[in-house]
Amino acid sequence: MASTIKEALSVVSEDQSLFECAYGSPHLAKTEMTASSSSEYGQTSKMSPRVPQQDWLSQPPARVTIKMECNPNQVNGSRNSPDDCSVAKGGKMVSSSDNVGMNYGSYMEEKHIPPPNMTTNERRVIVPADPTLWSTDHVRQWLEWAVKEYGLPDVDILLFQNIDGKELCKMTKDDFQRLTPSYNADILLSHLHYLRETPLPHLTSDDVDKALQNSPRLMHARNTGGATFIFPNTSVYPEATQRITTRPDLPYEQARRSAWTSHSHPTQSKATQPSSSTVPKTEDQRPQLDPYQILGPTSSRLANPGSGQIQLWQFLLELLSDSSNSNCITWEGTNGEFKMTDPDEVARRWGERKSKPNMNYDKLSRALRYYYDKNIMTKVHGKRYAYKFDFHGIAQALQPHPPESSMYKYPSDLPYMSSYHAHPQKMNFVAPHPPALPVTSSSFFAAPNPYWNSPTGGIYPNTRLPAAHMPSHLGTYY
């Protein structure tokens, strides 16, 4: 038993490659590397007769930190080399690919953790959410931010001065490489693709409105139909959201400057951000729209029946067109909703107009139900005495109906078709004794009647009549 243990220990102690680095001192001859890989690393090695190559590949990889300098060209030269080829050099981890261009994927992995010189937890870009809506100024701001955020060298922003968002989204990788180096083109194109595919996963427009409600530029964007959003850094979304929602008093321009200049001027960003005690809080300054000014002209025009008797819905619009009637009926917003604050008074006035002194709200409400199917108004559920006009349905109801098409009528100028017009109910039947065709000349083969050449003459071609409708003057031979 003891001899077996000694023999096993001797075998293990001979194979030093299991315990020492594969890139150790040159006197180690038994390394578990193939002949091709050893020649690539410039080391003399031989194949181990005891342990096959598959056993070496199945060994769990171990992280080895080499305490010596090595040539980077010899480390990263084979696909069989270890995954971690970093060496300790002067107290700093130096990668073997420092002098080789780094790809975008590895660069973004390193950029996932903010560098030590970052003093803020977010990078905000205040541009429209859809990059295709960017103006040339938005494109310039985005490029300036990307240069500061990713440290992009040799980016000439003037080359992009005539490019807006729509043209920017149409640019390919070759188009970017014509304006900036290949490495910068990869980063810009990837970030643009990210903005287009995943816009604002944690921020909504309501959050931005609460944070920027006092901004004059935001009010202009509301009036012009634009949308303004904030793009924080993807690694710190919750903190960025908290900062934005807890500082609604921060003005738009100061927030923009502090977010875009904090990377290059960390000390100035602290100075530009005012404290909450210095910025006065103001009330929401959104203008309150007057429904009587907006809906007044429309209700006055629709309430005038012109000629004829006024209908109930027109009478209600007549009352709503005058703000002095708000004690009994008033608008609820600008979407056509209204409420009868005193329904009995409204019913009494309607009874006076129609000379019905017994009119009350129950009769009035039953009359209003008739307009539901006509798409003139609807009942607002959950609210008493509240209704809503459908102005689109009213416009459809007021359109004049077109007259009946003439293609279903026979020409009225034909003398032998007078019986059809005398008896409209027999339009589809042949007269029992049609008169003879009029002949206007002495010749029997006169010019054909214009009816047979008219475009409406062939409406019913090849009409087959049942036997019961054959003329009675025909003989039995037929």
Swiss-Prot record:
Residues 34-47, 259-280 have a biased composition (Polar residues). Residues 113-199 form the PNT domain. One of its GO terms (cellular component) is nucleus. PROSITE patterns: ETS_DOMAIN_1 (PS00345), ETS_DOMAIN_2 (PS00346), ETS_DOMAIN_3 (PS50061), PNT (PS51433). SMART domains: ETS (SM00413), SAM_PNT (SM00251). Its main location: nucleus. GO terms for molecular function: DNA-binding transcription factor activity, RNA polymerase II-specific; sequence-specific DNA binding. Expressed in mesoderm- and, to a lesser extent, in ectoderm-derived tissues. The keyword Transmembrane does not apply. Keywords: Activator, DNA-binding, Nucleus, Transcription, Transcription regulation. Residues 34-56, 73-93, 242-303 are annotated as: Disordered. InterPro entries: Ets_dom, ETS_fam, Pointed_dom, SAM, SAM/pointed_sf, WH-like_DNA-bd_sf, WH_DNA-bd_sf. Residues 310-390 bind DNA. It is found in: Nucleus. One of its GO terms (biological process) is regulation of transcription by RNA polymerase II. Acts as a transcriptional activator. Belongs to the ETS family. PANTHER family: ETS, TRANSCRIPTIONAL REGULATOR ERG. This is Transcriptional regulator Erg. It comes from Gallus gallus (Chicken). The lineage of its organism: Eukaryota, Metazoa, Chordata, Craniata, Vertebrata. The gene is ERG.
